[in-house]
Swiss-Prot record:
Enzyme superclass (EC): hydrolase
Protein name per Swiss-Prot or TrEMBL: Archaeal Lon protease
Active-site residues per Swiss-Prot or TrEMBL entry: S990, K1033
Function summary: ATP-dependent serine protease that mediates the selective degradation of mutant and abnormal proteins as well as certain short-lived regulatory proteins. Degrades polypeptides processively.
Taxonomic path: Archaea, Methanobacteriati, Methanobacteriota, Thermococci, Thermococcales
Species in which this protein is naturally found: Pyrococcus horikoshii (strain ATCC 700860 / DSM 12428 / JCM 9974 / NBRC 100139 / OT-3)
Segments on the Extracellular face: 167-1127
GO CC field: plasma membrane
Key word Hydrolase present: yes
E.C. number(s) listed in UniProt: 3.4.21.-
Localisation: Cell membrane
UniProt superkingdom: Archaea
Length: 1127
């Protein structure tokens, strides 16, 4: 047995530093000092930063390549940083000019040009005024002569055209800041891993096809007037007097030029000027996306770009992992409350006076003159009176309900109440009472509970409603805070049969708000379908709808049509129908009664405000599903039941994608090329009249100017992109042009744009083969190539570095507690185990960091102040790699079906050991049989199982051993070797001794012990050579219930097992194949004869001991006597 093998030191481990917790460990400020174990790479990076050399980092994932790239950026000087501007070119508009200035100057230059443009606006105004004045004087002096009047009109028109053109030219002359380095405290670090051509090399925008559905909400400012409008309504209104129209293939485009008007649209950075609006008519496809986890939805053409947390992405590429940038919007503020009192002006006056009074302290008389407000009003305010609306605003502010933003977590509760008010709720015209009627007392109670969560305790009454035809319960409150709050948020006021219903704009900002609104609306007005059997099959009967009466169809129809459109995002089919009922109209939102639509509805609309209605609905669906086996849907019963069970558990899909073909789309073009639609930050068209230089977008190579460009897996870039990258590295400049041949951006090509970056490329050994030879030559000739180490010596100094690593990970994560000393010891032991070599520590620190974070999460869950050893041990069990989980499942499954056997002996069957991934072992059963050769010329070794090239060659090498000891021609045999159920694949030669043992057992018909497993490579001389992953292989054998493991003598010091595992296994190191057979074969006379023959056949030096025993000495290794008792 392996004596003293890889023993874990139970005594206090020398960590190179004394501490109680990692709180005491200082974490270096500079990233370069945080790099662990890669001393050679650190020195190279420091030299490369000083000399501005490129670096190629080759190594396994998780060894710190990207960290070294970021560290280099810290080492570069910031004094050399520059801003890059792009200017229009009067001589050739498709070749914008490029200018570089010291960092921080770019913004000043752009602001200066904008100031000049505004001055030009003033000149334009005075010029027009002068022309009007001259024309007016001429007409006056000519006593109204018609010819003079006609000439004057002509002069005015010409002046308007000239000044409008002058305005556009002054705006077009404002440069665009491509790269802004103002305020930077370190050189740029740009990670271009996986970037496409446009993102890496720069692009020129052209997106006239990128359009919206038109249902989106935008915020528009015209002069001092600011309002929330639907995009479709805004564009249609602007196109009442279009500037022009044309055809784009089969699509008719109508547009309006608004450059001469003072219209602005809200974007992420405030309001920006609107340039154009356009409408496109013709068949077009919209991609509709709902992400409930990240709470956003959008409906745009597939190539429409949106801003995600990872940069710009086309809508067609958006996945459930993408987070679209959202900007919080103010939904409710003081002025909106004031408007419910009709005190908009008075509220504004009070705020103006209050600021004036706090600043000057002047009395009301003087203030009245300076502010143009009535003296009597100011006298009352000076004495402490306030507008009624202000008192209400102050009360709502105490409840933190003002200002109310789109990110407020209470909005869903507000939305569900609002939905109920749109159904069976009411606010009277005088704003005196708010009421809600339901036949279900529980619904009333939930309505009240929700209001209390928002407003606290308030006065109300609940009583039987004797005015209704059926039995119902009435809730009523007179609380003016509640009434004014919901009126300001868009609740209908007065008799709903006479009121025009409009879906409040803020409800459309997020899918969660819309679903909450629908919950309240359906809980009040919705009807539940009934299950019924018919001769032709089963179906839902009765009504499944929301219906309301009105005296004017247009007061309800658009409201329900809009709801139906938004429901389609979730795959819920609904249509609107209007029926005449006496002197009124009944507008009905009718839902499809197919089982799929019913389940979709229940999945997303929980009907939480009306528990009885939900229970009734679920019972009807259960009755339907119970009858499905007898219907045409019998083949889908499991699918439908599974969907229904998820609904009952409250589960729902988080990412829903649908497509819709529409005939009209809408868009707007702003000065900055972006806007907020439904609160989401999106790009918009830059193609219609936008100057070429404003459509230029810098690439990552330009943003990395004077900094570091990091590209991991650089070989994944196309050869064309690698060639372009090489050109940029050589020239230190690279022009920007449109990357798409179909785009008008392809006609634009800027002057060369500076891109003097240091390239830090990374990858694995395969990267070298796939890299463009010239690119690698450039790096090698003008920089360094570094191989990243995967282990470092296990010394106290390096253990101290791992202590620092743990402290760094805790600080970097920011959400886990610090580690105690014994917990750090366990992390170091895990680093020893993962190194796979005695006396070494792993440098795959990303994986080790995963253990640190998992242990920290466990400590947080337990409410601990510090992470302890027990937390780390639990983390190692909980956070197993995927390969380890597969290996455990593999072993469990194989044992269950007796594919892995751990008792008795069998001929030709051996338990080999293999590795999945990097750190996970599996037991690999191997079987061999010998049969007469099928070919008269020669026998074959036939191997089955999913083997790699190296594994196949290793099997063939076994035949050399067999031929030598057998002493006869084995060509008359076919030897079949099967790797049982190796669907996961096998590569490497570590199964060589297992194959040799199985084949020899089959040839000699000697059973192999099934409680023995083995791993090791085999040379043609019979030597057992070292292999990798010995520790995880032994652990797999232990988990499978095997008692003895054979390993190469060379790997003896690489075994690292915990004490509890050491007790469960006997480990035997060997140097030769005869030693393997000695242990593995079942004891018999045939075995003794076989081993003697094998030993005699091995090309090894022999000698006799004084006692007469024959020894085989193998290069100074262990010696095994030939004795009968050896087993």
């Amino acid at each position: 047995m392996l004596s003293g093998e890889s023993e874990m030191d139970e005594e206090r481990m020398d960590l190179g530093i004394e501490f109680e917790t990692t709180e005491e460990i200082p974490v270096p400020e500079r990233l370069i000092d945080q790099v662990i174990g890669q001393d050679h790479a650190v020195e190279v990076i420091k030299t490369a930063a000083k000399q501005r050399r490129h670096v190629l980092l080759i190594g396994e994932p998780g060894t710190g390549k990207s960290m070294l790239g970021q560290a280099m950026a810290e080492l570069l000087p910031t004094e050399e940083l520059e801003d890059i501007l792009v200017f229009p070119n009067p001589e050739d508009e498709n070749m914008p000019r490029i200018k570089t200035v010291p960092a921080g100057q770019g913004r000043k230059i752009v602001e200066e040009y904008r100031r000049k443009a505004k001055e030009q606006e003033g000149v334009r105004f005075y010029l027009l005024f002068f022309v009007f004045f001259i024309v007016a004087m001429a007409v006056f002096l000519s006593h109204g002569d018609p010819n003079t009047l006609l000439l004057g009109v002509f002069v005015i028109l010409v002046a308007l055209m000239v000044t409008a053109n002058m305005r556009f030219k002054t705006q077009a002359m404002v440069p665009k800041l491509l790269v802004d380095n103002s305020g930077r405290k370190r050189a740029p670090f740009v990670d271009a891993t996986g970037a496409h051509a446009g993102a890496l090399l720069g692009d020129v925008r052209h997106d006239p096809f990128q359009c919206f559905s038109g249902e989106e909400v935008i915020i528009v400012e015209k002069g001092k007037d600011r309002k929330v409008v639907k995009l479709r309504e805004f564009v249609e209104d602007a196109l009442k007097e279009p500037s022009g129209e044309g055809m784009d293939g089969d699509i008719k485009v109508t547009y309006k030029d608004l450059r001469g008007e003072d219209v602005r649209i809200l974007t992420k950075d405030g309001f920006v000027k609107l340039l154009y609006v356009n409408k496109r008519e013709g068949k077009q496809k919209l991609r509709k996306i709902v992400n409930l986890d990240k709470d956003y939805w959008l409906a745009v053409t597939p190539d429409h770009k949106v801003f995600t947390s990872e940069g710009l992405k086309e809508a067609g590429e958006i996945t459930e992992k993408d987070e679209i940038i959202r900007v919080p919007l103010v939904i409710l503020d003081g002025p909106k409350i004031a408007s419910t009192y009709g005190e908009d002006g008075k509220f504004d006056d009070y705020i103006r006076w209050k600021k004036y009074y706090e600043k000057t302290g002047n009395g009301y008389k003087r203030a009245a003159k300076e502010l143009n407000i009535k003296e009597s009003t100011l006298r009352w305010w000076t004495q402490g009176a306030k507008p009624n609306s202000l008192k209400m605003i102050e009360e709502l502010e105490k409840l933190n309900l003002l200002p109310l933003t789109s990110e407020d977590s209470r909005l869903e509760k507000v939305a569900i109440i609002l939905g109920a008010l749109f159904s069976d709720g009411n606010i009277d015209r005088n704003f005196n009472t708010l009421s809600f009627i339901s036949s279900e007392r529980k619904a009333i109670e939930r309505f009240v509970e929700t209001l209390k969560e928002l407003f606290g305790e308030f006065n109300y009454e609940i009583r039987d409603n004797h005015e209704s035809l059926g039995k119902s319960i009435l809730f009523r409150t007179w609380d003016r805070r509640i009434i004014r709050f919901f009126v300001a948020l868009g609740a209908p006021v007065g008799n709903k049969t006479k009121v025009k219903l409009e879906l409040p704009w803020w409800i459309k900002l997020k899918p969660s708000l819309f679903l909450a609104f629908m919950d309240g609306l359906y809980s009040g007005d919705g009807s539940v379908p009934r299950f019924a059997r018919y001769e032709e099959g089963i179906k839902f009967n009765g009504t499944f709808e929301i219906a309301q009466l009105t005296d004017d169809v247009e007061k309800k129809l658009p409201f329900f049509e809009e709801i139906a459109w938004y429901l389609s995002f979730f795959g819920i089919k609904a249509k609107v129908r209007v029926d005449k009922t006496g002197d009124k109209y009944k507008v009905r939102l009718i839902f499809s009664q197919s089982i799929d639509n019913v389940l979709n509805f229940l999945e997303f609309i929980p009907i939480s405000l009306s528990p009885a209605k939900r229970e009734k609905f679920l019972r009807e669906v259960e009755s339907y599903l119970a009858a499905v086996p007898e219907s045409s849907l019998a083949g889908r019963i499991e699918e439908l039941r599974e969907h229904f069970n998820r609904i009952k558990k409250g589960e729902r899909r988080s990412f829903i994608e649908t497509w819709e073909v529409v005939n009209v789309t809408y868009n707007v073009t702003t000065e900055t090329g972006n806007l907020l639609a439904n609160g989401l930050f999106v790009k918009n068209s830059g193609g219609l009249g936008t100057p070429a230089h404003l459509r230029v977008e810098p690439g990552m190579i330009h943003r990395a100017h004077k900094g570091v460009l990091f590209i991991d897996e650089i070989a994944t870039l196309s050869l064309k992109m690698q060639q372009s990258l090489l050109t940029a590295m050589q020239e230190k400049k690279f022009p920007i042009t449109g990357q798409s041949e179909l785009s008008s951006g392809a006609m634009v090509r800027t002057e060369p744009v500076p891109c003097d970056f240091i390239l830090v490329a990374a990858g694995n050994l395969d990267t070298i083969e796939k890299m463009h030879p010239a690119l690698r030559s450039r790096i090698r000739g003008y920089g360094y190539e570094v191989y990243m180490r995967t282990t470092m010596p296990d010394t106290p100094e390096n253990r101290r570095k791992l202590v620092q690593f743990v402290a760094q990970e805790v600080k970097k994560d920011g959400r886990i507690p610090h580690f105690t000393r014994d917990a750090v010891e366990e992390i170091v032991r895990e680093a020893q185990r993962r190194a796979g070599r005695k006396g070494h520590l792993t440098l795959r620190l990303r994986d080790l960091g995963g253990v640190v974070r998992a242990a920290g999460d466990i400590a947080v869950r337990k409410g601990k102040k510090y992470v302890t050893r027990e937390d780390v041990l639990e983390a190692l069990k909980l956070a197993k790699p995927l390969e380890k989980q597969l290996a455990d499942w593999y072993i469990e499954r194989k044992k269950e079906y007796q594919v892995i056997r751990v008792e008795g002996g069998e001929i030709g069957r051996v338990n080999g050991l293999a590795i999945i991934g990097e750190q996970s072992g599996i037991v690999l059963p191997i079987e061999a049989i010998v049969a007469p050769a099928a070919s008269k010329e020669e026998g074959k070794i036939i191997v089955t199982g999913k083997l790699g090239e190296i594994a196949k060659e290793a099997v063939l090498n076994v035949s050399a051993i067999i031929k030598r000891y057998k002493g006869e021609d084995i060509s008359k045999y076919d030897i079949h070797v099967q790797f049982l159920q190796t669907y996961e694949g096998v590569e490497g030669d570590s199964a060589s001794i297992s194959v040799a043992t199985a084949v020899i057992s089959a040839l000699e018909e000697i059973p192999v012990r099934q409680d023995v497993a083995m791993t090791g490579s085999l040379s043609v001389r019979g030597e057992v050579l070292p292999v990798g992953g010995v520790t995880p292989k032994i652990e797999a054998a232990i988990e499978a219930g095997i008692k003895t493991v054979i390993i190469p003598k060379s790997n003896e010091k690489d075994v690292f097992l915990s004490p509890d595992k050491r007790k469960k296994i006997k480990i035997i190191p060997v140097e030769r194949i005869d030693e393997v057979l000695e242990v593995a074969l079942v004891e018999s006379e045939k075995k003794r004869e076989l081993i003697k023959r094998v030993r005699e056949s091995l090309p090894l030096w022999m000698e006799e001991t004084p006692s007469g025993e024959t020894l085989h000495e193998h290069k100074g290794g262990a010696t095994l006597p030939l004795e009968e008792s050896k087993a």
